[in-house]
From Swiss-Prot:
GO terms for biological process, alphabetical: microtubule-based movement
Pfam families: Kinesin
Keyword Nucleotide-binding: yes
Taxonomic classification: Eukaryota, Viridiplantae, Streptophyta, Embryophyta, Tracheophyta
Gene Ontology MF terms in the entry: ATP binding; microtubule binding; microtubule motor activity
Keywords, ordered alphabetically: ATP-binding, Coiled coil, Microtubule, Motor protein, Nucleotide-binding
Gene expressing this chain: KIN7O
GO CC list: microtubule
Organism name: Arabidopsis thaliana
Name of the protein in its database record: Kinesin-like protein KIN-7O
Residues annotated to bind ATP: G79, Q80, T81, N82, S83, G84, K85, T86
Length: 1273
């Protein structure tokens, strides 16, 4: 178990930031002096002045060397954006980074290791917006992650290049780096927008030697070295990311957050506790899963900035690094072992053990061999002893039979002297037949010499055997080690031929040695493995011990039975021996007497009696012998069964050994076959390599020969007669190629003319758009004039209303003056006149209100039409942009066609000159297009100025709809023109395909004449290289133009944004002015209220005058006072309730009618009393009525003015909202246009790359064809 190595590297600071930095570094710890809790310790901390080599040598160098030995390794840089991660990993030409240093160090260690052969593969991928892209094969995008038992976690479809030098690796890396996503932010000009993983797969095995092919091991070590450059975490507030950059930053932060959670879980030991670690939440953590708590050596380089602005980001980076310190990995060597490799490895280990035994333990091995030989000898002796015992038993049985035969002969001799009956003879014959059996322990004495000696020998031997066996059999069975050292028992030292002597002279061997007996049939022990021999000895020893236990138990049982029988026979034998001795003495006496006197009848009787006794004894003896024979037979059968089992076991062992030998031989044969196959494959590869080298040398020779042939052809042009047909064919080919060239030139001229026509059409369309813009500007000016006219008319109307208001006020004053002079009879007429005047004023007010409403509606309509006109102008702009894009597409297609024509015309110098002319024309076209673009930009500025002018207008736009319809028709025409352009483009693409087919035909014809035009083909290759460089230059120029076009669009969008901001500011100012107007209107309302109060004071004064005038009639004065008081209250109420003007108007009219009715009543009452007084009071009454009417008109006017101002404010607010909506739409459209431009740029770049790849393939095909042609020559 080894933990992750974590080092910290600080980015260099400016002098100002270094003074204000809150972080302090001391040795391998970093802390904030003001915060005691913010202190971190790491394996290494590198200050601002350190070099990348120091960072590499801290831990990465060891990881690289371990990767060569078969350990997985991972190194990745972590930190916020603009902290120096890419500089640490990639470096620069002056100061190389970790990846170049690791690559060079890797190849250096491989070159130093001469005992192994290596195969290196590299891959380079990026994780962009959670999509895996192959940087070595840009067409491979959105790859998937898979997992299996053999490969583990891997990316399916990822391209892996076999590399053989560090220069090749770095070149491939540069190629992949050119396809990496890099963007610009406020914090970094070249900010990495994706995570990249540079992976080296290292395979190695031991070198195959000619002498020791069988000794080599096929175990393959496979290790993976990952060098990861992570994208930095960022904050949108600091980087200013928007749109695509914001999306990229969110994906980067999400993946880094998942990495942080995985590190946190592993540092807390969640995985060891059976918890869940979210490796699958991000593709980055899924790919790096083996490096995070798995089978790998891992190092983290944490890049930080000590500036005070980025204190929070530095703190989070250091917390991540401190958590990573607690994560442990378990790295081990990754080897792929086959069965053959395992067998070879075991053989190698066995051979190493043997060599060790021979070298270091030679004495000990000799002793072990001697012990093994002794055990084998002992086992063979034991075996021979068993065989001798069997043979001796056979000899003993044969000897017993021989003794019985001799006894039978003696009995026959005796029976010849005595006449016996047939019954006795039969008995004797039966006795002789039965007496042939083995006589083991008890043999009767039939004669003095032979039988007594035999019996004494047998008894002495039996007693010695019994004594020896009793000592060994009374106790338990002894182990083999004691049996070997058991004392010997000499049963009969004098008898050298006896069986027991041979048995006792043999030493009991070690039973484990029975299997390993060195006999002629068995192979020598030196040819076997000592480990295998020991295992077989242990197994056979166990089997032999089991068989020996079984044999001993059976033998003990049989011997116990024999002992019992011997006891019985001993008891019977004493009496039988005595009787035998007596019978023998008597027989001898009788024999001697029989010689003397043969005719003595008493002697005959005695002989008969003795004969009967002998027969009885013989019967008993035969029965006992039968029992003994049965027991012996059972014991022998058991011994035979045991021996058969032992033989079967030995046969099984022998068969198992043979099977093992056969299996070993098969394994050896298979190993040899596998080795032969591998050797054949390797030899085939070597042969292929040598053949390739030979072919290359032959190709060079053919090149040299072609050059010599060309020189010879140049010299042989003098022999025109011999080479005339070749020259004729060559001239025909040149003519055909010139004709094809002319056709190509014509097609190019047609394409060029079509492009010129398209350019002219675009210029015409541009002129039309300019005319439309001029017309729109004139319309806008007319609308401005009309708006000014409407404003003047509105001013006139307002002045007219004010004059009418003043007239009405004067009229009311006149009426108030006339009230005092009116009589009671004329009050009714005046009342009617007042009503009529009031109604007229009402109608006039209604007319003015309707006019104002109509004007406001017209204004809203004009603003809506204005907004629609602006939208249509935007559409025109977008269509113009689309036309410009089409022009750029046509330019790109023209460039592609130029490239194809360049490839086709590279064979002849004349075509090159024409192509240069075409390039000049194309350059002129590009200049014209650039001028057109500048003009379009100028027109855009003019249009933007016109839009700014239009934003401030609030006048009517009546005729704009018709003109917009006309512009729509024109737009439809433009769309039709665009479709025509598309069809032309399709036709041009078909022409291009035809050109490509023609090129293919030309190539085929060139292949046929390659034998005769080798020099020209070589020149063509050189020219192709030149034109490929030109193509690259053209593509770079196109890319620069596209970038410039993008920058121009961005500048225009920024201008539009600034203008829209200005419009917003103007709208805000208008809102402020409207608020000021509202305040002014409120102040006017207050002033009106104050004037109404003044008028109420005047009414009070007039009431006092009426009181003085009505002194004559108290009733009339009281009525007038009450009426005046009511009018005062009503006026004050009307001033307070200014918001509810209509209700107050109704209330005032009703009150006025009541007053008029009261005035009529008063006039009737006063007509009878005093007309003169009424006439005097008429003037103040009229003044009052006039003042009331004037107040009513003022109230109506104030209400109308307030309503108008409210309506104006509402309309202005609506206009502002519409403008804001239009601005937001413009912003969205600009964003969409920028995204479309980016997509199209990506598609165009992808197409260019595909075409470049196809051209490269064509070049390779041409080279192959050249090589094939050279081989055929």
């Amino acid at each position: 178990m080894e933990r992750i190595h974590v080092s910290v590297r600080a980015r260099p600071l400016s002098s100002e930031d270094a003074k204000t930095s809150p972080w302090k570094i001391s040795s391998d710890s970093i802390f904030m002096p003001n915060h005691s809790s913010l202190a971190f310790e790491f394996d290494r901390i590198f200050r601002e002045d350190c070099k990348t080599v120091q960072v590499y040598e801290a831990r990465t160098k060891e990881i690289v060397s371990a990767a060569v030995r078969g350990f997985n390794g991972t190194v990745f840089a972590y930190g916020q954006t603009n902290s120096g991660k890419t500089h640490t990993m990639r470096g620069s030409p002056i100061e190389p980074g970790v990846i170049p240093l690791a690559v060079h160090d890797l190849f250096d260690t491989i070159y130093q290791d001469a005992s192994r052969e290596f195969l290196l593969r590299m891959s380079y991928l990026e994780i962009y917006n959670e999509d895996i892209n192959d940087l070595l094969a840009p067409e491979h995008r959105k790859l998937q992650i898979h997992e299996n038992l053999e490969k583990g976690i891997f990316v399916a479809g990822l391209r892996e290049e076999i590399v053989a030098s560090p220069q090749q690796v770095l070149e491939m890396m540069e190629f992949g780096e050119s396809h990496r996503h890099i963007g610009e932010t406020n914090m970094n000009l070249y900010s990495s927008r994706s995570h990249t993983i540079f992976r080296m797969i290292i395979e190695s095995r031991q070198k195959m030697q000619d002498e020791g092919v069988g000794n080599s091991c096929d175990a393959v070590r496979v290790s993976v070295l990952n060098l990861v450059d992570l994208a930095g975490s960022e904050r949108a507030a600091k980087t200013g990311a928007e749109g695509v950059r914001l999306k990229e930053g969110s994906h980067i932060n999400k993946s880094l957050m998942t990495l942080g959670t995985v590190i946190k879980k592993l540092s807390e030991g969640v995985e060891t506790q059976g918890g869940h670690v979210p490796y699958r939440d991000s593709k980055l953590t899924r790919i790096l899963q083996p490096a995070l708590g798995g089978n790998a050596n891992t190092a983290i380089i944490c890049n930080i900035t000590l500036a005070p602005i980025h204190a929070d980001e530095t703190k989070s980076s250091l917390q991540f690094a401190s958590r990573a310190l607690r994560v442990t990995n378990c790295a081990h060597v990754n080897e792929i072992l086959t069965d053959a490799a395992l067998l070879k490895r075991q053989k190698k280990e066995i051979e190493e053990l043997r060599s060790k035994l021979k070298t270091s333990h030679s004495d000990h091995s000799e002793e072990e061999i001697l012990n093994l030989r002794n055990t084998l000898l002992k086992s063979e002796l034991e075996r021979e002893r068993i065989a001798l015992e069997l043979e001796e038993e056979k000899k003993a049985q044969a000897q017993r039979e021989r003794v019985l035969q001799e006894q039978a002969k003696k009995i026959k001799n005796l029976s010849s002297m005595v006449l016996l009956s047939n019954r006795d003879e039969k008995r004797e014959q039966d006795h002789f037949k039965k007496g042939k059996r083995r006589d083991t322990w008890c043999i009767g004495k039939l004669s003095r010499d032979s039988t007594s000696e035999d019996q004494s020998n047998v008894l002495s031997r039996g007693s010695s055997l019994e004594s020896a066996r009793s000592e060994r059999e009374t106790g338990p069975l002894l182990p083999f080690s004691e049996l070997v050292n058991e004392p010997l028992y000499n049963i009969n030292e004098e008898d050298e031929d006896s069986i027991e002597g041979t048995l006792e002279d043999s030493v009991l061997p070690d039973p484990c040695a029975l299997v390993n007996v060195t006999s002629r049939k068995k192979p020598s022990i030196k040819q076997k493995n000592p480990v295998v021999v020991e295992n077989e000895l242990d197994r056979i020893q166990r089997e032999y011990e089991a068989l020996l236990l079984q044999y001993e138990t059976e033998r003990i049982i049989s011997e116990i039975q024999i002992e019992c029988l011997k006891v019985k026979l001993g008891e019977d034998g004493l009496s039988g021996d005595a009787k035998c001795k007596q019978s023998e003495v008597v027989g001898n006496v009788h024999c001697e007497e029989h010689v003397v006197n043969l005719r003595d009848p008493e002697a005959i009787l005695l002989i008969k009696q003795l004969q009967e006794k002998i027969n009885m004894l013989e019967l008993e003896k035969s029965s006992s012998n039968r029992n003994l024979d049965d027991l012996v037979m059972v014991a022998t059968e058991q011994n035979i069964c045991a021996r058969e089992k032992f033989a079967e076991i030995q046969e099984e062992i022998h068969a198992a050994r043979e099977e093992a030998q056969v299996a070993r031989e098969q394994l050896v044969s298979k190993e040899s076959e596998v080795i032969d196959v591998i050797n054949e494959n390797f030899n085939s590869l070597v042969n292929v390599a040598t053949e390739i080298e030979v072919l290359e040398s032959e190709f060079q020779k053919y090149k040299a020969s072609v050059e010599t042939i060309s020189s010879v052809m140049n010299e042989g042009l003098q022999d025109f007669a011999f080479f005339s047909p070749l020259i004729h064919d060559f001239t025909l080919f040149v003519r055909q190629s010139s004709e094809q060239h002319d056709s190509l030139i014509n097609s190019y001229q047609t394409v060029q003319s079509s492009l010129k026509k398209k350019v002219l059409d675009v210029e015409n369309e541009k002129l039309l758009l300019q005319e439309q813009c001029a017309g729109l500007q004139s319309q806008i000016e007319e609308l401005n004039q009309e708006a000014q006219k409407h404003e003047t008319s509105l001013k006139m109307l307002s002045e007219h209303h004010e004059s009418e208001r003043s007239d009405l006020l004067s009229h009311i004053e006149c009426l108030e003056k006339d009230i005092g002079s009116l009589s009671s009879s004329s009050l009714a007429k005046e009342k009617e006149n007042l009503r009529k005047d009031f109604e007229k004023t009402k109608t006039k007010l209604k007319d003015t209100e309707s006019k104002l409403k109509n004007s406001m509606q017209d204004k809203t309509k004009l603003e809506a039409e204005k907004a629609s006109a602006e939208r249509e102008l935007k559409r025109l702009h977008s269509q113009k942009a689309l036309l410009e894009r089409d022009i750029s597409k046509q330019e790109s297609f023209a460039g592609k066609r130029r490239d194809s024509l360049l490839v086709e015309r590279s064979a002849n110098q004349s075509l090159q000159e024409e192509f240069k002319q075409l390039e000049v024309l194309a350059f002129e076209m590009e200049t014209t297009i650039a001028s057109l673009e500048e003009e379009l930009a100028a027109e855009r500025g003019e249009k933007e100025e016109a839009l700014c002018r239009n934003d401030g207008l609030g006048s009517e736009i009546t005729d704009l709809t018709e003109k917009l319809e006309h512009s729509n028709t024109k737009l439809e025409h433009l769309q039709n023109d665009v479709t025509e352009l598309k069809t032309r483009l399709e036709v041009s693409s078909s022409d291009q395909q035809q050109l490509e087919t023609n090129v293919k035909q030309l190539l085929e014809e060139k292949e046929e004449l390659a034998m005769h035009l080798a020099n020209s083909l070589l020149e063509m290759e050189e020219e192709k290289a030149i034109w490929s460089s030109k193509e690259k230059a053209l593509t770079e120029a196109v890319e620069e133009k596209i970038r410039l076009y993008k920058n121009i669009q961005i500048e225009s969008l920024s201008k539009e944004m600034s203008e829209e901001k200005k419009e917003l500011e103007s709208c805000r100012l208008e809102c402020v002015t409207l608020a000021d107007r509202l305040r002014c209107s409120e102040e006017n309302a207050k002033q009106d209220k104050e004037s109404s109060l003044e008028k109420s004071l005047e009414i009070d004064r007039l009431g006092d005058e009426l009181r003085s005038a009505d002194a004559v009639s108290k009733q009339s004065q009281e009525v007038l006072k009450s009426d005046i008081d009511i009018l005062k209250s009503e006026v004050q109420h009307a001033c307070k309730m200014s918001d509810t003007f209509q209700r107050e108007m109704d209330y005032v009219t009703s009150e006025r009618q009541g007053l008029l009715a009261r005035i009529e009543e008063l006039s009737k009452e006063l007509a009878s009393s005093n007309r003169w007084q009424i006439e005097n009071a008429k003037n103040p009454i009229q003044d009052l009525t006039l003042k009331i009417s004037s107040q009513e008109t003022n109230l109506h006017k104030d209400a109308a003015a307030e309503n108008k101002e409210k309506a104006k404010l509402k309309m202005r607010l609506r206009g502002m909202q519409a403008r804001l909506d239009a601005i937001s739409l413009r912003y969205k459209q600009s964003v969409q246009e920028s995204e479309l431009m980016n997509r199209k740029f990506k598609e165009a770049s992808a197409k260019l790359k595909e075409k470049l790849a196809s051209k490269a393939l064509e070049v390779l095909d041409l080279k192959k064809q050249l090589s094939a042609s050279s081989r055929t020559m």
